[in-house]
């Protein structure tokens, strides 16, 4: 293709397109490799009783340090003040779940927006985590298709994506015998990712 392009500007444009395609393929390979590694590693890891709150606070702090000044995106943590939020889980995997969901929320958010991470307990003492953003929300009627491998509903302005991040999250959530649901926010425009961990 480059050989057929005589104009310098056309060559530069083609190189730019090819460069983006290479980056997209690299991300795809990296994400898919992560899935394969996780599927092997998960079978060897042991679940134990852990406190969810400090894990979430740590991830929220890390993301705030990166995005609060860079893009003026504020990430807030809230809870319903029900003391401890214990779950049966693998600490580094729970951290990965929250980080992936926050990364997804940030990538769909414009600058100067807010993302809220809420932790609460249901009446039957399940632990619920909601990650609410102010992005574009979901156009799909079946919102849970976003967890399918290689599925991506990301508009071009938010950059290209492999469509594997939320599938990795779903696999990790399943490992914890938990559930995850995607929906649009009721109070305003944006997405709501809700995880329900079974009571300990």
Regions found by a protein language model. Name each.
Residues 40-45, 82-89:
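Conserved micro-motifs of the catalytic ATP-binding
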Residues 138-150:
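Short conserved segment of the HATPase_c
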Residues 105-106:
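Short helix-loop "hinge" at the ATP-lid/N-box region of the Bergerat-fold HATPase_c
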